[in-house]
């Protein structure tokens, strides 16, 4: 197993050039948005989500997710999608608005697609007004577990690559597989990639897991 894992290491970790390119795009985006927030007097900040934010992304990724977190007290009764759009239009010529339980947005920098999800900055789950308000908690939960267990983020990448090669990676309807977040949860629950594989062999229909037990 170790030889097989070593053989795919280069396929699941970005090289320095790709990592620097991604960092440069993110830095440019964050600097522009932070400046525009200040210019418009909007009380909000950016929080990196998705696999990039959790440190579990695979090479070749050209999409980054951001949460634009709005002050709960000031914007709790406002349409924060409208505010978010105003900020983005102050920077980018082309801003794609996407429908959701709360509308979100997509912009491009070079060949990178950046999705921006407006959320309320909450400190407790029960303060959420929309499911997306809870999403940063999901990111922090993965990051907490990655920090607590050595090499867990490597195992998450490994599991994603394995599922992808097996044709079961992706929650899209035409795939019907495991999303990136669910893959990460499975690795946390079972304690690593190899343990996950062994558990999969014993799965039955409607296997239920509870990561807090």
Where are these regions (language model features)?
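A short, glycine/Asx- and small/polar-enriched loop/turn
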Residues: 60-64, 110-112
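Conserved catalytic core of two-metal-ion nucleotidyltransferases
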Residues: 33, 82-127
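Long, highly charged amphipathic alpha-helices
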Residues: 24, 28, 32, 82-87, ...
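Short, conserved charged micro-motifs
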Residues: 74-82, 195-198
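N-terminal regions immediately upstream of nucleotidyltransferase
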Residues: 1-61, 71-79, 105-106, 119-122, ...
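Non-catalytic peripheral regions of nucleotide-handling enzymes
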Residues: 17-20, 106, 110, 118-174, ...
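Short hydrophobic/aromatic beta-strand micro-patches
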Residues: 67-69
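Conserved nucleotidyltransferase catalytic core and NTase-mimicking acidic/glycine-rich helix/loop elements
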Residues: 151-213
